[in-house]
A protein has these predicted regions:
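Conserved RNase H-like, two-metal-ion catalytic cores of nucleic-acid enzymes
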Residues: 3-10, 14-46, 88, 92-182
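Extended, Lys/Arg-enriched charged tracts that mediate electrostatic binding to polyanionic substrates
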Residues: 97-117, 212-234, 343-345
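Active-site-proximal helix-loop-helix substrate-binding element of RNase H-like nuclease domains
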Residues: 143-144, 151-158, 162, 179, ...
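Short secondary-structure boundary/capping segments
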Residues: 122-124, 194-207, 335-337
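Extended acidic/polar, glycine-enriched regions
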Residues: 48-103, 157
Length: 345
């Protein structure tokens, strides 16, 4: 029977890990006792195989951290890798077997009104109302809005909400019920995720935004883009953010003229986003043709689903992470994966 993690982090001096055991979801907080290695006549060697090492065990993460702080620069310390990866290496010594059908993937997209001052709705300000959200989970679609709408497909459900607070509350409740291991969508890392967390924090409360995490915590961070610009995003602890545009760039090894969802869907699926050119902008579409506006929101989510049905990039990413014995998001980078591979070999 398969037992494997989907996300493992260090938090509050413990290892927080979630995953599946024989298809059943588990969540554990582990009081981890790490080890380090020192030069000595022991049974271990460094990666070159030339330096003999002896193992030194500690009673807690804090004790090991204090030891490193005290003796760094005094003598060589080996095996100083982040503790979540050491825990994974010790818990899964052999090859990790997983079942991708277990892994809960929540694919979503939000729409917003125009800000009161006009212009683009920036995620860090989140000063425009969220007026529609669609979630795709396990090939079922759930759309939240405040107007009247009739679903066009049997696997689509529309949830009419009283107002924006009701919409966001119901969205978070469904998210929590699904308990996703992975979230995806198009440009969600730098738009949808920071926007929705900042908006929930602003009009409901930061505590309610924390409900998006199975560990009850979302953490704001600024990330430098390729052009050196800093953008806000969030770590939703326990949930892997696998933005599909990012993994598309990482794993397809082709250069596209544009990485908009419209262009990539056309290149890969010979299909485009829903056309609303008869209306000046999305706000006018929302005001004048609500049915088409919701169709547009659903279509964006459908396109991401169909892209992965064709390309299977999420499964490729899972496979790579389990080969390396790291977290899913680590595979999007490079250095962390190699650090973990070196540690395990």
């Amino acid at each position: 029977m398969k037992r494997y993690y989907t996300n493992t982090i260090q938090q509050n001096g413990r290892i927080y890990t979630r995953g599946y055991d024989s298809g059943k979801q588990y969540f554990n907080k582990i009081k981890y006792k790490p080890s380090l290695w020192l030069k000595g006549d022991g049974d271990y060697t460094d990666i070159s195989g030339k330096i003999s090492l002896t193992k030194k065990s500690f009673r807690s993460i804090k004790e090991a951290r204090d030891y490193i702080k005290q003796y760094t620069g005094v003598f060589d310390i080996y095996g100083d890798l982040q503790n979540q990866y050491k825990y994974i290496a010790e818990s899964w010594v052999n090859e990790i077997e997983f079942d991708s059908s277990d892994i809960r993937v929540l694919n979503f997209d939000i729409e917003t009104m125009s800000p009161p001052e006009g212009g683009f709705p920036y995620p860090d300000k989140a000063n425009a109302e969220i007026n529609a959200i669609t979630i795709e989970y396990n090939n079922s679609y759930f759309t939240f809005g405040t107007g009247d709408y009739t679903p066009k497909a049997d696997n689509s459900k529309y949830i009419k909400c009283d107002n924006e607070i009701d919409l966001l509350t119901k969205f978070v409740n469904l998210w929590s019920f699904i308990s996703p291991d992975v979230i995806t969508g198009w440009n969600i890392k730098f738009f949808d995720v920071p926007y929705i967390i900042n908006r929930i924090s602003k009009i409901i409360s930061p505590e309610f935004a924390n409900k998006l995490s199975p560990w009850g915590k979302v953490i704001s961070k600024n990330v430098k883009t390729l052009f050196g610009k800093e953008q806000q995003t969030y770590d939703i602890l326990g949930v892997s953010n696998l933005d599909y545009v990012i993994i598309y760039k990482k794993f397809t090894f082709v250069t596209r003229e544009s990485y908009t969802l419209n262009n990539i869907a056309f290149e890969e699926l010979n299909e485009k986003k829903l056309d609303y050119s008869a209306y000046e902008n999305l706000f006018n579409l929302y005001e004048k043709n609500y049915e088409l506006f919701i169709d547009y929101n659903i279509k964006d989510v459908e396109l991401v689903k169909r892209l992965d049905d064709k390309l299977n990039l999420l499964n490729l990413l899972y496979t790579t992470s389990y080969k390396a014995k790291c977290n899913y998001e680590d595979v999007i980078g490079t250095l962390k994966v190699w650090d973990v591979i070196c540690y395990n070999h």
